[in-house]
Regions:
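N-terminal leader segment of winged-helix/HTH proteins
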Residues: 1-34, 80
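C-terminal regulatory/oligomerization modules of transcriptional regulators
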Residues: 1-8, 128-150
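Base-recognition residues in the alpha-helical recognition helix of bacterial helix-turn-helix
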Residues: 15, 42-46, 71-73
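Alpha-helical linker/hinge and terminal dimerization helices associated
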Residues: 17-20, 24-28, 63, 106-125, ...
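N-terminal helix-turn-helix DNA-binding core of bacterial DNA-binding proteins
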Residues: 26-66
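Residues within helix-turn-helix
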Residues: 56-57, 68, 75, 95
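Charged, amphipathic alpha-helical coiled-coil/dimerization segments
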Residues: 75-135
């Protein structure tokens, strides 16, 4: 048996992660309440994980999307009452975005709605298997996050 080269193995890892991402996002989105998309949920989740307030530009940079794409996502979230977009009092042009109580509620509802999917995953893979891959995935994410400006 011929062993794959290191670069082939690395490519296979990235390929698998990409496919898993597509499949997981589709499965996750089918569980989301209130017509929420994965992109919208991700923005709500960012406010819980990272910071309570941000400019649209900061969010666009964090998600590596255009300002226009982020503005569209924020507009849809604001229409649903899940974020508040208001002028920055210290700037005539900038806006500040925060998650609302309804946004926090729908985020929690989304996490609750995805529990059956997560439980189904645990019927195929035990928690030790899942926990074992986390350190590598976290390190890879951190490495790629540091490189994003390169």
């Amino acid at each position: 048996m011929v062993m794959p080269s290191s670069s082939e193995s690395t490519f296979r890892v990235f390929n698998e992660i990409g496919i898993i991402s597509q499949l997981a996002n589709n499965a996750f989105e089918s569980c989301l309440p209130d017509g929420l998309t994965v992109s919208q949920f991700s923005v709500l989740n960012w406010f819980i994980r990272v910071d309570v307030e941000a400019t649209p530009g900061r969010l666009a940079a964090a998600f590596m999307v255009t300002k226009g794409a982020m503005t569209n996502t924020l507009k849809r979230l604001a229409e649903k009452g899940f974020v508040d977009v208001r002028p920055d009092e210290n700037s005539g042009r900038r806006k500040l975005v925060t998650i609302t109580a309804d946004g926090q509620r729908v985020r929690l509802a989304a996490l609750k709605a995805v529990e059956p999917l997560l439980e189904e995953v645990l019927t195929q893979f035990n928690s030790a298997q899942i926990s074992a891959c986390l350190p590598f995935l976290e390190q890879l994410r951190a490495f790629l996050d540091l490189r994003r400006s390169v």
